[in-house]
């Protein structure tokens, strides 16, 4: 049995410049009627920042147990795959063969139920989420429970958004949980001073008896693997439906379902809302560059702005800012 104090990091990465991968993706796009708003080319764009993700982890979270680096098979040419803390996982290593290849991030993340050696406690990162300052294990887990924010927020349907998928998540949550019981059993976890002004959301939504949605901060999520398995056992049909989708589809679920389950079960410890922040890259990413200098937030997520019209220029600015913050190579890089 693994040490319950161990915390793994899981990060998924796609090399959007890999010629063979792009060719396979293009072939399957012709075969499947994909939803372009959920599968735009910008979602696969390569920013060249992955080495700084590892530098940040080594500098700010040296206590991490293992890093599960999940890819289709490709590996950055600078990465030392023999590093003792690194576990390079190919899709074929844990995703059922019948569902491969997949270009669907939800399949890649929801299939973590099959990653046998993964610790009970892990933090799921996207490759656009970076540790921005020193963090402790207790920033992610406390008393063996995930740290998170229990903030209600109504689901707002928008074009080019994840709203349909989030709606599917919430249908399942309302199937198993009563908002009344949630608040009766864990009132202080939802009405907590650590949420700041976001407390108003929970107050304003009190008149509604059903759960209308949860606030998603778009930062790495702390998970207990047992919660993934519990939800899979109860709702394996929609898991399998999701697994069949080569590309993201409006009829599926994503890993936030497990997060909502943890929140609804009261299996979490409240965390300060200002722990992390989500930024969208724009043509002038001044706010992101300043944040890298000041480290106001422990975690930052840098979302690719689909409206960027000077990509190469902005990419250069971002790489320069990260290089200034993390100039020293990490031990994860080849010598």
UniProtKB/Swiss-Prot annotation:
**Protein origin, superkingdom:** Bacteria
Q: Which GO terms describe its biological process?
A: polysaccharide biosynthetic process
- Pfam entry (one): Stealth_CR2
Q: Keywords for this entry?
A: Exopolysaccharide synthesis, Transferase
Coiled-coil spans in chain:
none
Q: What class of enzyme is it?
A: transferase
E.C. number:
2.7.-.-
The terms under GO molecular function for this entry are: transferase activity, transferring phosphorus-containing groups
In which family does this protein belong, per the annotation? Belongs to the stealth family.
What additional remark is attached to this entry?
Stealth proteins are part of a protein family that is conserved from bacteria to higher eukaryotes. Family members were first identified in microbes as proteins that help pathogens to elude the host innate immune system. Microbial stealth proteins are involved in the biosynthesis of exopolysaccharides. Stealth proteins are predicted to function as hexose-1-phosphoryltransferases.
Q: PANTHER family, alphabetically?
A: N-ACETYLGLUCOSAMINE-1-PHOSPHOTRANSFERASE SUBUNITS ALPHA_BETA, PTHR24045
Q: What is this protein called?
A: Capsular polysaccharide phosphotransferase WcwK
Q: Which organism is it from?
A: Streptococcus pneumoniae
Give the encoding gene's name: wcwK
């Amino acid at each position: 049995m693994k040490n319950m104090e161990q915390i793994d990091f899981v990060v998924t990465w796609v090399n959007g410049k890999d010629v063979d991968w792009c060719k396979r993706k293009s072939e399957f796009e012709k075969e499947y009627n994909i939803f372009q708003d959920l599968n735009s080319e910008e979602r696969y764009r390569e920013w060249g920042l992955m080495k700084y993700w590892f530098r940040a982890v080594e500098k700010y979270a040296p206590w991490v147990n293992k890093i599960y680096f999940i890819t289709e098979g490709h590996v950055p040419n600078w990465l030392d795959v023999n590093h003792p803390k690194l576990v390079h996982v190919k899709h074929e290593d844990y995703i059922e063969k019948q569902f491969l290849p997949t270009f669907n991030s939800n399949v890649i993340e929801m299939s973590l139920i099959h990653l046998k050696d993964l610790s009970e406690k892990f933090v799921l990162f996207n490759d656009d989420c970076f540790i921005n300052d020193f963090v402790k294990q207790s920033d992610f887990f406390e008393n063996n429970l995930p740290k998170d924010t229990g903030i209600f927020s109504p689901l707002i349907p928008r074009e080019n958004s994840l709203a349909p998928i989030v709606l599917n998540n919430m249908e399942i949550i309302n199937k198993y949980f009563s908002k009344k019981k949630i608040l009766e059993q864990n009132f202080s976890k939802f009405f907590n001073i650590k949420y700041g002004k976001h407390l108003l959301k929970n107050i304003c939504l009190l008149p509604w008896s059903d759960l209308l949605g949860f606030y998603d901060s778009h930062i790495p999520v702390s998970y207990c693997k047992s919660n993934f398995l519990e939800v899979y056992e109860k709702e394996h049909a929609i898991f399998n439906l999701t697994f069949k989708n080569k590309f993201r589809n409006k009829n599926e679920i994503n890993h936030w379902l497990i997060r909502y389950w943890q929140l609804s079960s009261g299996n979490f410890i409240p965390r300060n809302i200002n722990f992390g922040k989500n930024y969208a890259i724009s043509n002038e990413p001044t706010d992101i560059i300043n944040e890298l200098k000041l480290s106001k937030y422990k975690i930052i997520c840098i979302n690719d702005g689909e409206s960027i019209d000077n990509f190469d220029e902005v990419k250069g600015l971002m790489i320069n800012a990260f290089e200034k913050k993390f100039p020293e190579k990490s031990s994860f890089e080849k010598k």
